């Protein structure tokens, strides 16, 4: 996904590009704003920008072409997602759900597009009356994943969708 695919947010996209070009990229960014403003789409396009360069960069380089191919399917090994999950009846009573429990459902949702709602995600997970949260086990898993060395030698990125649902 390229910045050009994000609706609006021109000033923010320009500022993000400028931070990268100047080498002043912080270790964490929080994208916040009203519901429906494309924060997730912006975060995902910025992750693509960091992992594979901008859309005008020469794509003939094998590493850039490879990164772009992985990002087309949102399967880049240095891009990780954390998101609210539910406890399914089939899970043991002591199991705290983590994002990897719902990786297939998440992948299906983001492949449909980067603009989606919590209701769409709940439906994708098969939720009935549960509340979706980001568990303590997810925080542990995130720490474990981010402690690993970058697979492709560049950035490691974690996108936490709806961090306000951390419990």
Question: Where in the sequence are the language-model features?
Answer:
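Clamp-loader machinery-focused feature within the broader ASCE/P-loop NTPase space
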Residues: 2-165
């Amino acid at each position: 996904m390229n910045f050009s695919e994000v609706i609006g947010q021109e000033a923010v996209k320009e500022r993000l590009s400028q931070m990268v070009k100047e080498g002043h990229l912080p270790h964490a960014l929080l994208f916040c704003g009203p519901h429906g403003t494309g924060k997730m789409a912006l975060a995902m396009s910025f992750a693509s920008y960091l992992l594979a360069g901008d859309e005008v960069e020469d794509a003939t380089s094998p590493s850039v072409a490879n990164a772009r191919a992985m990002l087309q399917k949102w399967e880049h090994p240095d891009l990780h997602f954390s998101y609210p999950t539910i406890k399914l009846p089939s899970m043991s009573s002591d199991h705290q759900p983590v994002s990897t429990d719902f990786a297939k459902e998440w992948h299906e949702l983001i492949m449909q597009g980067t603009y989606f709602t919590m209701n769409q995600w709940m439906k994708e997970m098969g939720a009935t009356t549960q509340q979706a949260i980001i568990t303590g086990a997810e925080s542990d898993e995130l720490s474990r994943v981010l402690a690993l060395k970058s697979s492709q030698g560049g950035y490691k990125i974690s996108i936490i969708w709806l961090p306000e649902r951390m419990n």
